[in-house]
C-alpha cells in the first residue's frame, strides 16, 4: 500500500513539535537519555536480533550480494558497538549554546553569536541499521528531532531499533517524537518527505551516488550531500617510495567499502620507473584489480585497460584506477575533472609541491603524506559523525555535532534604541 502524503506530513508535524522541546534541554538531560538508550539496546538485544534475522533472511532469498547482507546484519558485537557509540556521543561536548563569537558595540549593546539546533533533520539511508542509532544519537545530543528513512530491506530491524530508542527517550523525560521512522517503506514515503520544506529543515542522504543524486535533484527541502568518495592518491616526483607504497596500500586496501578509501592512483612519470613495479606487485598481491593506462599496462600486462568510467567510479571494492602523469599540473587537472570532492592525498618531500596541491584541490579534505582513510570524524578527533559532506554549504567534511547546528545572534542591552 502506498504511503500517503498526510501520514508523512503528520510525522513531520510531530517532529517539529518535539524539536521545540529538545532545543532548550540541558546537556545533562540529553546525556541521560543517550545513556538510557545505550542500556536499552543491550537489554532488548534478543528482540533486535530476531527482527534483523527476518531482514537478512529476506535479503538472502532475494539474491542480495553477500557484501550487502553483511552491511544489513546485526550481531551481539555490533549492537554493543552501537550502544558504545551512544555512550561516546554522551561524552562529547554539547555544541548548543556555545558562543561562537561576541563583541560589545560602542553603544554598550552586547552581541553574541550562539549555536542553536537546526530543528528537524531527515536522514535517508540504505541498508546499514546501525545508522538508525548513530543518527538518532547525534541528533538528540545536538537538540534536533530526527526523521529516519532507512532501506526497506532493514525495515524490521529499524522498527525495533526506533521503538527501543523512543521508549528510552520517554523514560528519560524526552519527547518520543524526537526520534521517528518515516511511515512506509515505498518510494512514495521518500518523495513526500522531500516535499516538506518548512517542516523539515534539512535532508541528509547517506548511501550511493544514485541515492544522493536523486535526493538532491528531487527535494525541495535543503540537502547536505554526503559520502560519495572518488578519492585520489598522487605520488609526486619527489616522493619517498616506501612512504608512497605504504600510503597507497593503506588508502586502497585497509577497508575498501568506505567512502574515504582511495579509488585512483596517479604517479608522476619521473618516479614511475622506480615506483610502478613495486606498487603494482603489492596491489596485485593484496587482491586488487588494477585498471591501468598504457604506461601501467606496459609494466603489468595483467592490468585491465582503464576507461573514463573507471576514472569516475567509486569502486568500494578491490579495484583501483592507476595512471601516469607528466607533472603536478596534469595530476591536478585530472583530479579537478574526476574527483567527487571528498579527499585527495599527495605523497611528496617537496614543500612547494605540497602547498600547491593543497591550494589547488577543491575537496573537503586534502592530505599531505597521509592516507585518505583519515577523513573521518573520530580519526579527526571530532567524535562521531553523521557523514562526510562533499558540498560547500552548510558544512564540509566530517559532520559532527557542531555541523548539526546553526547560529543565532543574541543582543543583550539595557533599553538600547536605534
Curated annotation (Swiss-Prot):
Cellular localisation: Cytoplasm
Pathway: Amino-acid biosynthesis; L-proline biosynthesis; L-glutamate 5-semialdehyde from L-glutamate: step 2/2
Catalyses which reaction(s): L-glutamate 5-semialdehyde + phosphate + NADP(+) = L-glutamyl 5-phosphate + NADPH + H(+)
Protein EC: 1.2.1.41
Biological-process GO terms, alphabetical: L-proline biosynthetic process
Keyword NADP: yes
Pfam family of the protein (one): Aldedh
Top-rank taxon, per record: Bacteria
GO MF terms, alphabetically ordered: glutamate-5-semialdehyde dehydrogenase activity; NADP binding
UniProt GO cellular component terms: cytoplasm
Record keywords: Amino-acid biosynthesis, Cytoplasm, NADP, Oxidoreductase, Proline biosynthesis
Disulfides per UniProt: none
EC class (word): oxidoreductase
InterPro entries, sorted: Ald_DH/histidinol_DH, Ald_DH_C, Ald_DH_N, Aldehyde_DH_dom, G-glutamylP_reductase_CS, Glu-5-SA_DH, GPR_dom
Matching PANTHER family: DELTA-1-PYRROLINE-5-CARBOXYLATE SYNTHASE, GLUTAMATE SEMIALDEHYDE DEHYDROGENASE
Its job: Catalyzes the NADPH-dependent reduction of L-glutamate 5-phosphate into L-glutamate 5-semialdehyde and phosphate. The product spontaneously undergoes cyclization to form 1-pyrroline-5-carboxylate.
Similarity comment: family membership: Belongs to the gamma-glutamyl phosphate reductase family.
Alphabetical list of HAMAP family matching this protein: ProA
This protein's name: Gamma-glutamyl phosphate reductase
Organism: Parafrankia sp. (strain EAN1pec)
Amino acid at each position: 500500500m502506498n504511503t500517503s502524503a498526510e501520514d508523512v506530513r503528520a510525522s513531520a508535524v510531530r517532529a517539529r513539535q518535539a524539536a521545540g522541546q529538545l532545543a532548550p534541554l540541558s546537556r545533562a538531560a540529553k546525556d541521560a537519555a543517550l545513556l538510557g538508550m545505550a542500556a536499552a539496546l543491550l537489554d532488548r538485544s534478543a528482540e533486535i536480533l530476531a527482527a534483523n534475522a527476518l531482514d537478512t533472511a529476506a535479503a538472502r532469498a532475494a539474491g542480495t550480494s553477500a557484501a550487502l547482507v553483511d552491511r544489513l546484519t546485526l550481531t551481539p558485537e555490533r549492537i554493543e558497538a552501537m550502544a558504545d557509540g551512544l555512550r561516546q556521543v554522551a561524552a562529547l561536548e554539547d555544541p548548543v549554546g556555545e558562543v561562537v563569537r561576541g563583541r560589545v558595540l560602542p553603544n554598550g549593546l552586547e552581541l553574541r553569536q550562539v549555536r542553536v539546533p537546526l530543528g528537524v533533520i531527515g536522514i535517508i539511508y540504505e541498508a546499514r541499521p546501525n545508522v538508525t542509532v548513530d543518527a538518532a544519537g547525534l541528533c538528540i545530543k545536538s537538540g534536533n528531532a530526527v526523521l529516519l528513512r532507512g532501506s526497506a530491506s532493514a525495515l524490521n530491524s529499524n522498527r525495533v531499533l526506533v521503538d527501543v530508542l523512543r521508549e528510552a527517550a520517554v523514560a528519560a523525560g524526552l519527547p518520543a517524537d524526537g526520534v521517528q521512522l518515516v511511515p512506509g517503506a515505498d518510494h512514495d514515503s521518500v518523495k513526500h518527505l522531500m516535499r516538506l520544506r518548512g517542516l523539515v529543515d534539512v535532508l541528509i542522504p547517506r548511501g550511493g551516488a544514485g541515492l544522493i543524486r536523486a535526493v538532491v535533484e528531487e527535494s525541495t527541502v535543503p540537502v547536505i550531500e554526503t559520502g560519495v568518495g572518488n578519492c585520489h592518491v598522487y605520488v609526486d616526483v619527489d616522493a619517498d617510495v616506501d612512504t608512497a607504497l605504504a600510503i597507497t596500500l593503506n588508502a586502497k586496501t585497509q577497508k575498501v567499502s568506505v567512502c574515504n578509501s582511495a579509488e585512483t592512483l596517479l604517479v608522476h612519470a619521473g618516479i614511475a620507473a622506480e615506483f610502478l613495479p613495486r606498487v603494482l606487485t603489492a596491489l596485485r598481491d593484496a587482491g586488487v584489480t588494477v585498471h591501468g593506462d598504457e604506461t601501467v599496462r606496459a609494466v603489468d600486462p595483467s592490468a585491465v585497460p582503464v576507461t573514463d568510467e573507471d576514472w569516475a567510479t567509486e569502486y568500494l571494492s578491490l579495484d583501483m584506477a592507476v595512471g601516469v602523469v607528466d607533472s603536478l599540473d596534469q595530476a591536478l587537472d585530472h583530479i579537478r575533472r574526476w574527483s567527487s570532492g571528498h579527499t585527495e592525498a599527495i605523497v611528496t618531500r617537496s614543500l612547494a609541491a605540497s602547498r600547491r596541491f593543497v591550494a589547488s584541490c577543491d575537496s573537503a579534505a586534502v592530505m599531505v603524506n597521509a592516507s585518505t582513510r583519515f577523513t573521518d570524524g573520530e580519526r579527526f578527533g571530532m567524535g562521531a559523525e553523521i557523514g562526510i559532506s562533499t558540498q560547500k554549504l552548510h558544512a564540509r567534511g566530517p559532520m559532527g555535532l557542531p555541523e548539526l547546528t546553526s547560529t543565532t545572534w543574541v543582543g543583550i542591552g539595557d533599553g538600547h534604541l536605534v
